Amino acid sequence: MRLMKKLHDFAPPASPVPIPIIYRSTDMNTPLENHELLESVIATLRQGERLLAEISDEHYTRKLPAAFNASIGGHYRHCLDHFRGLLNAARSGDLNYDLRERGTLVENDRFAALNATRELVVGWEKLNLSVLSRQFNVTCKTNYATTGSQTSASSVGREVMYAVAHAVHHYALIGVMGGIMGLAIPAGFGVAPSTLKHQQETAQAAGASE
């Protein structure tokens, strides 16, 4: 209940700011959806980069009892793990979400996290868009009662959608933690694109009725 109170009190403001288009490939032979999926990855990483540039090292690594003793760095490293693992698997092979390291330099050093983010942006910008349609197997431990992991068929594009949505939810938690520490979180940070769209439509409808 304490965390839920913090979520209510300190959630970052939801501003109807559209996610900017950061990257547009000149390859017009790939589906428009592939262009948009790649743009969503780049925009999400750029949001993280902006946040890291605005907070201090101490705020990045501070562990908060109200957030299960987690840190912004821990949540952010977790997001980058998914984008990095997916990028590597997109080029060749299958994807295993369980193959991640915890307590790394990215989690404990803000500048290392900034550099890792920028490297990922470059990697995703160079990705051949046709790869997003590639089918592969995804492994992740989802069952508490078993010792093994579970595997399912998927596609790179489908996992891009998951990685972005996953990051947005962790960004929301990061926003809560930043609010607890009194930080000014960028407007729209941790707000889902569908939520921003809904807010825009609601505001437009309210304006039209006045």
Identify the meaning behind each predicted range:
Residues K5-K6:
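Polybasic, lysine-rich low-complexity intrinsically disordered segments
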Residues D9-A11:
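Short hydrophobic alpha-helical segments enriched in small aliphatic residues
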Residues P13-D27:
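Short, Lys/Arg-enriched N-terminal segments with co-localized hydrophobic residues
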Residues R24-R46:
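Extreme N-terminal tail/first-helix region
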Residues D27-L32, D81-K126, L132-G148, L183-E210:
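Short, helix-capping/interhelical loops that line the mouth of catalytic, cofactor-
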Residues V41-G48, I72-L86, R110-W124, A163-I174:
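Alpha-helical transition-metal enzyme core signature, strongest for iron centers
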Residues Q47-S71, L87-L105, T147-A153:
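Helix-loop segments that flank and shape redox-cofactor active sites
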Residues Y171-F189:
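Short conserved catalytic/interaction loops centered on acidic-Pro-aromatic/His motifs
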